[in-house]
Amino acid sequence: MTFPDGITLVTGPSGVGKTTLLRALHGELGTSFSSIVKGQKTSLMPQQQYWIGYMTMYEQLSMTTGEQWQTIAEALGLQSHFHKLPDQLSIGQQQRFWLSWVLADNADWILLDEPTSALDDDWATATISLFDRFRRENVKAKMIIVTHDVRLLQGNIHNHRIAL
């Protein structure tokens, strides 16, 4: 299996292995899929984000990606939430923070599992625009997005689509 540069949407019914595909590409399962990305950096946004409860979002994100995440987080409307703890944020806000973290990681492969599932239409639209900008600015990077979200499917930002 090969993945072209740009954005690939992976769709299909629940339970067919879309999340498993992302985990395999990320190297979590020790499968032959790991050889596809061997020697390249991957960054994964899982469906459920896990945070350190006693650290602010600013502390957590700065600890791993430096300051690059802030510009992305600001584009996602999060600047007033930098010094909040995870449990003070909605699931959608947490999802946008994780997305800013992953995109700031400068990985060769960006693996996103349902990245807009907790977002309202306005923030989903902003996120889709961010994906489109990423695609244009990082022509050699690969972004694999697992989704059921019609907004992403109709957003016309992807280069390729795989239906499982």
What positions do the PLM features span?
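Walker B catalytic motif
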Residues: 85, 114-115, 119
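Conserved ABC ATPase signature
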Residues: 85-89, 93
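Conserved ABC ATPase "signature" region
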Residues: 67-81
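Helix-to-loop junction immediately C-terminal to a conserved catalytic motif
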Residues: 26
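Hydrophobic anchor residue at the start of the ABC signature
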Residues: 99
